[in-house]
Amino acid sequence: MVDASGRAAAEGWRKMEAPPDGAADLVPLDRYDAARAKIAANLQWICAKAYGRDNIPEDLRDPFYVDQYEQEHIKPPVIKLLLSSELYCRVCSLILKGDQVAALQGHQSVIQALSRKGIYVMESDDTPVTESDLSRAPIKMSAHMAMVDALMMAYTVEMISIEKVVASVKRFSTFSASKELPYDLEDAMVFWINKVNLKMREITEKEVKLKQQLLESPAHQKVRYRREHLSARQSPYFPLLEDLMRDGSDGAALLAVIHYYCPEQMKLDDICLKEVTSMADSLYNIRLLREFSNEYLNKCFYLTLEDMLYAPLVLKPNVMVFIAELFWWFENVKPDFVQPRDVQELKDAKTVLHQKSSRPPVPISNATKRSFLGSPAAGTLAELQPPVQLPAEGCHRHYLHPEEPEYLGKGTAAFSPSHPLLPLRQKQQKSIQGEDIPDQRHRSNSLTRVDGQPRGAAIAWPEKKTRPASQPTPFALHHAASCEVDPSSGDSISLARSISKDSLASNIVNLTPQNQPHPTATKSHGKSLLSNVSIEDEEEELVAIVRADVVPQQADPEFPRASPRALGLTANARSPQGQLDTSESKPDSFFLEPLMPAVLKPAKEKQVITKEDERGEGRPRSIVSRRPSEGPQPLVRRKMTGSRDLNRTFTPIPCSEFPMGIDPTETGPLSVETAGEVCGGPLALGGFDPFPQGPSTDGFFLHVGRADEDTEGRLYVSCSKSPNSHDSEPWTLLRQDSDSDVVDIEEAEHDFMGEAHPVVFSRYIGEEESAKLQEDMKVKEHEDKDDASGRSSPCLSTASQMSSVSMASGSVKMTSFAERKLQRLNSCETKSSTSSSQKTTPDASESCPAPLTTWRQKREQSPSQHGKDPASLLASELVQLHMQLEEKRRAIEAQKKKMEALSARQRLKLGKAAFLHVVKKGKAEAAPPLRPEHFAKEYSQHNGEDCGDAVSKTEDFLVKEEQREELLHEPQDVDKESLAFAQQHKAKDPVALHELERNKVISAALLEDTVGEVVDVNECDLSIEKLNETISTLQQAILKISQQQEQLLMKSPTVPVPGSKNNSQDHKVKAPVHFVEPLSPTGVAGHRKAPRLGQGRNSRSGRPAELKVPKDRPQGSSRSKTPTPSVETLPHLRPFPASSHPRTPTDPGLDSALEPSGDPHGKCLFDSYRLHDESNQRTLTLSSSKDANILSEQMSLKEVLDASVKEVGSSSSDVSGKESVPVEEPLRSRASLIEVDLSDLKAPDEDGELVSLDGSADLVSEGDQKPGVGFFFKDEQKAEDELAKKRAAFLLKQQRKAEEARVRKQQLEAEVELKRDEARRKAEEDRVRKEEEKARRELIKQEYLRRKQQQILEEQGLGKPKSKPKKPRPKSVHREESCSDSGTKCSSTPDNLSRTQSGSSLSLASAATTEPESVHSGGTPSQRVESMEALPILSRNPSRSTDRDWETASAASSLASVAEYTGPKLFKEPSSKSNKPIIHNAISHCCLAGKVNEPHKNSILEELEKCDANHYIILFRDAGCQFRALYCYYPDTEEIYKLTGTGPKNITKKMIDKLYKYSSDRKQFNLIPAKTMSVSVDALTIHNHLWQPKRPAVPKKAQTRK
């Protein structure tokens, strides 16, 4: 538990173990009383504020005292002060302005003053605290605690505010306003603390780096590097908070903040900064915090060690006021000792580094390097290798943390990691990139299992605990010459960081051979590409060097023609054991980032760990995608950062299945800017085309489509089929870019679990690069500088390229990737809000496209950089490679577009057939598709012709509203798609892959003659401009539209249409923007326009598919208005069972809102549809091309039906390549599409109904459980006639809504009436019960008086019985008693308890928790605590005469008795409850007390212990209560038998005279005014005549009260 090596820990532990040192005072958690701690902390705070910490009156310093029974109570002076409001007025006067202070005269004035400041005094149950609560005589402590909390909050608000925090943080850090802006004070505190801790991380990282550089020298580099590494291991861990109370309880974060502001007073070495702190460490830190506060901050720490350590939630206001005070001291007061640390301290160091980096490199001979690689013994030194410059070999080192501001000048102005509270500071990105992910405590994304043990990580290290995120982990690429790592395993290159939403550092993608046939073979020759990877971990630091000169054995099928110089890429994975490995290669053979030594972990084959085990180990953020294939698919992405490229340089590496021999001269760094990466987003994958050594069809297209990745939440890696490979399915590389993406990625990860190709996303974190290397890289990779700032990738992803091509050329709604790309292509260069705001702000992410940079453009941007050195040459040639890839990718995208068009055509025909089927049920003859005029006429009869104007008004409103909603909703849905796409592309078997390939060929052939034009990529630029205009227009109209929408709904008249019933769900229009393409004037009337089956987004939240505004298109005269989806359910994918919406065949598909997309200029209305193929749990998402009309004309109905049905049955989910819809997502269609269940085509008799789902008719049989749905457009040339029908449908819908609303209102009224009746009935019952109770009490009283009179007469010889003048019991006890005859039992409420308790006997526990405990004197727990609250008369008048003595009986013996009452018995005490302890107490302390009676008492108690009866009765001689005998009472039989003593053997009902109850706390018996025995009776007397006349010689007359 305790790290003895840590000074703080050891010291703290000593204190805890040695009681004399004071640590024994620590209250264990199980005995820690949070309620008491709250009272103590609040009283200490308010007294300190009222009087000054050093001037608190002596009697107020400790507010508690312990009474004789060792119970803790609040001192009367404190209670008096609280009740008098003096403390509150004093403290409140310190906050208020001068003239307001005079008005503070009492509790109410303080409450009002606080409320004027927006702070309301509320108890924990949200009831407002009133003046009466605060001045109530038995103090109500909960109200006073709420008052003190409100004053603390007022103080907090005075000292800290969100604005102040933001202003403070801006001085030393940067952040994303859209993601990280605090939303309340607590969040602001967490924000401030985290930012300071991140700043400290940066500073310490820079210091470590500076020391490294200064210590290094060519002669002693290795030794010094090693030594520095060892010292760096001790580097402190600066924690980041997620929860203020939970994460801040160890004091480490606050001490780090104090150190930042007061480095001289709080030395960093004095603070115990560990990732996992023990209790001793925490205690040490808290003591340190308290000492600092007492010495420098005016003793503002008002908590105990336990308060801070256990951090109960009730103390949150106290902790917050302390943090606010810290902030106030450091940011407002700023005493002399406050001197914040800053980067300024490192400027001199930076200058030194610059000078050093400008020196010529020190050449190191190949022989020297080989010497380190030659023997394992050299491993220890090899990993100490210094930064080596190898200019001639093109081995570009990358420094992954640019420090200089100019690095960030090009479009990287503000990084915006999606995760909040992560560092976005430009100038410190270098040092915190490794830390901003691990900073989420205990969720470290560092190079450990988070993903660093990717699901196929070459090393499974179950024995290793997760890497502390505290380590400043400089990760570099490491080459393992000893080949300890299995090169063929997917985790040989364990990419140590998943693409996570907060990743700011470079990402690494590695597709490594997952299933090489002979893994050990490559290990033996040590030349496999992946055998270059040595995953090392020396004291939790990583260095990885990629060796590029490895020549795989030609016999190894996995590396058919891999170039000897193919650049390998590895990610850093932590290895489990501390083995060292030689890690240097020849000068031209590795990329080195030698920041810290690393230790080689054993190869995976040495460990008996299955892939499943490894996968199970991965942390939530790790992402590993695998695809089944014959051989592993190679993809290595490497990031090499130029001086300004923010680690955006990629080196593609040919590998295994794709035989690409890339000459070393051609493999250079390719700068691919991925905005998403700058923002912690997607990977950028450099694509490369195979050279003649490999088939031209081979190759990975690993593209970074920035627009795609940022918003879509994933990246496509499409691999084109190579002749020697057996599959060509696209890979889906997922990344997470938002909070909600985590789940998607995790699920996708599970989906890919069993598949073969590992696609490991990672990013270097904490990579430290010497300034010398940085300087070198400036020259070598300068060509990447200008456009490597994180804009859209020049190398589009297959999907994005395809999308943009098809979007530009054919107005086809390909995929939302394409739309998103178009929307981003034109953006400003600054990336600050592109990623961070994607999920939060409606417009920033969508209207902020980044410019599209092609490889050619990129080449032109920095022509002067090419040819200056081999590195530039390599890069320029790789640029050419990428340009070739671009062409190839365009061809593939065109093919995909054709496939989508084919699918759209099939869907069109299928939908048409379904519509025919539906219509035939309404018409006797089997005719061609029913013309829309039929419906138009029918509806016009019902609706009249007068509704057109109103509808046309509504149409414009709704279209605009849809556009607005699209903008609002799209960013939120972006992240939902990654899992969907992953599922969609998860090929179940090779057959599906072949089927996909065959489909591609077929679709290409089919569409070659039907699609009249080739995709023109250049149209993207035009659409981009128009898109931006559209978006800006829509943004301006948002506010107006929201008002117009409501007006629209009110204006629409309703016309009843018989025979139809509409859905009545009342929803707002939240539809995304839909644009419908211009219709071809030559469209055949009998054919509908091909539907665009758009993107069903895999939105777990159930949002509809987001549809983009591709661009404005002029339309011809044939343009007709097309209604968009209904107002009701567009945004909500709500399933409507078919059975719930019976429809007549006369209104199929017309039940839609009439909102033509129609401004006269005509925007293309893109409608999204989801076709849910339930058999595959996939979605076919198809997009229509702009030639869809032609397609629909040329394909016969039969062909379409056959093709569609066949397609639905097959695994053709890859056709659309983008979206999928979860299984449970209801089928939804939009606008003028008809959605028809395919099962109805195959089984027409199954369901004869049409179910209207807002924009269309869905034919669904028994709910949504259908394998497929077809869609088709209605012919737009008949739109005018259909418009009338749709108007009618719209009005019908309005009418139905009104009817539904009316019915709903009636139901609500009925429910309210029922509730009222119930309340009246209960009130009547209560009244009757009270009357009965009153009558019964009166009866009892009369009986009692009568018997008392009779008793006086009978006992004349004995004298009048004394009425035992007992002092009334405290009201608190009084509240808990019960009438023995009442038969009722009600528990006392906390309020009554605290209201009636007197201050002197107030128990702390009962005051703090308002629970009726510990009010019994002597600390004896009450065995029978009940309440008299149900008998208000009896329970509220303790000062009655003797006839009410029984009322004051103690709660300790107040079981309800069952009286001789014939009315309803509310409660019967179970007879199993025993009164043995009470009788024991009575005999010991009352009946036989004293030394004289001790022998007798002992004998009686012995008998009592021997007996196992439940209930006992004491027999008294008479009203004088002289003890005579002890009896056992059996309530079931109501028999009373003598146990011991003097008296009759048994007592019957008739013998009983009086009944008594014993009060344990007052040690006396009280007479009960009842005649009937019950278990609540403790003693009794029998009639006097039953006693023998002989009196005992020495009667023992016990005192009734001791």
UniProtKB/Swiss-Prot annotation:
Q: Which residues carry this modification: Phosphoserine?
A: 217, 371, 375, 416, 431, 563, 575, 589, 629, 722, 728, 738, 740, 1080, 1398, 1427
Q: Where is the CKK domain?
A: 1463-1597
Q: Where is the composition biased (Low complexity)?
A: 797-808, 830-841, 1206-1220, 1393-1410
Q: Which residues form the Calponin-homology (CH) domain?
A: 216-331
Which segments does the entry list as coiled coil?
A: 873-909, 1016-1048, 1291-1343
List every stretch annotated Disordered: 426-471, 603-637, 772-808, 825-870, 1075-1165, 1206-1226, 1301-1448
PROSITE patterns reported in the protein's UniProt record: CH, CKK
Its Gene Ontology biological processes?
Answer: cytoskeleton organization; microtubule cytoskeleton organization; neuron projection development; regulation of cell morphogenesis; regulation of microtubule polymerization
Bias (Basic and acidic residues) occurs at 603-620, 772-789, 857-869, 1103-1114, 1301-1346
Q: What is its main location?
A: cytoplasm
What is the top-level taxon of the source organism?
Eukaryota
- In this UniProt entry, the residues modified to Phosphothreonine are 512
Q: Which residues carry this modification: Phosphotyrosine?
A: 1537
Pfam families linked to this entry: CAMSAP_CC1, CAMSAP_CH, CAMSAP_CKK
**GO cellular component: a single term:** microtubule
Q: Which disease is it linked to?
A: Cortical dysplasia, complex, with other brain malformations 12: An autosomal recessive disorder of aberrant neuronal migration during brain development. CDCBM12 is characterized by severe to profound neurodevelopmental delay, microcephaly, cortical visual impairment, craniofacial dysmorphism, and seizures. Brain imaging shows lissencephaly, severe hypoplasia or absence of the corpus callosum, cerebellar hypodysplasia, and dysplasia of the basal ganglia, hippocampus and midbrain.
**How is the subunit organization of this protein annotated in UniProt?**
Interacts with spectrin via SPTBN1; the interaction is direct. Interacts with calmodulin; calcium-dependent it prevents interaction with spectrin.
Q: What family, per the record?
A: Belongs to the CAMSAP1 family.
- Protein purpose: Key microtubule-organizing protein that specifically binds the minus-end of non-centrosomal microtubules and regulates their dynamics and organization. Specifically recognizes growing microtubule minus-ends and stabilizes microtubules. Acts on free microtubule minus-ends that are not capped by microtubule-nucleating proteins or other factors and protects microtubule minus-ends from depolymerization.
Domain free text: The CKK domain binds microtubules.
Q: What is this protein called?
A: Calmodulin-regulated spectrin-associated protein 1
Species for this entry: Homo sapiens
Q: What phylogenetic lineage does the species belong to? A: Eukaryota, Metazoa, Chordata, Craniata, Vertebrata
**Originating gene:** CAMSAP1
